[in-house]
């Protein structure tokens, strides 16, 4: 991580987010009880990253996977506190529950000790301002544009196949000029 942070700083990259999953990483939405990194070892990585940064503005965000991996709130808060104490500039917390309650509880119990980043992929029904009021600092709409792109590509592909022509689709897609600008 030291070398990565140094290289990112050399290139004026604003920050990095590292997560407490073990290698090889598996998708957070697959199963529960996934193994997580040892807290002390992960804290050592955070310290190493922060010690090697060459710009004061560089941010290291620690992604806590305890909730989404099924380890529970107590474990999530314990890890977040350890990572924050070790120098993390912010905490990213994630949940696969659809009601947002787990994230709102975390934010309430966390108490704005440092910035918190959330990724509401599964709890999209909860208005963003509810999280802002509870203390979330950053909201990442992680894959909605990708998913919208997939739907649009499917629609255009179906239309081209159905009409056996590009003409009908041309008015619904970006121009070639738009791609290169």
Description of each model-found segment:
Residues 140:
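Active-site loops and adjacent core secondary-structure elements that bind or stabilize anionic groups
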Residues 51, 144-181:
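Extended, intrinsically disordered, low-complexity segments
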Residues 1-137, 148-154, 158:
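Alpha/beta enzyme core
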């Amino acid at each position: 991580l030291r070398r990565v942070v140094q290289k990112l700083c050399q290139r004026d990259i604003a920050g990095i987010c590292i997560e407490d999953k073990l290698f090889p990483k598996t998708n957070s939405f697959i199963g529960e009880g996934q193994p997580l990194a040892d807290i002390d070892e992960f804290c050592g990585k955070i310290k190493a990253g922060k010690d090697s940064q060459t710009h004061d503005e560089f941010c290291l965000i620690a992604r806590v996977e305890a909730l989404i991996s099924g380890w529970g709130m107590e474990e999530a808060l314990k890890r977040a506190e350890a990572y924050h104490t070790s120098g993390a500039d912010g905490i990213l917390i994630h949940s696969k529950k659809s009601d947002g309650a787990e994230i709102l509880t975390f934010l309430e119990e966390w108490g704005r000790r440092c910035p918190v980043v959330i990724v509401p992929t599964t709890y999209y029904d909860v208005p963003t301002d509810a999280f802002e009021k509870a203390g979330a600092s950053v909201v990442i709409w992680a894959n909605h544009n990708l998913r919208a792109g997939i739907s649009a590509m499917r629609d255009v592909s179906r239309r081209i196949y159905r009409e056996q022509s590009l003409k009908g689709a041309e008015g619904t897609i970006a121009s070639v000029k738009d791609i290169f600008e």
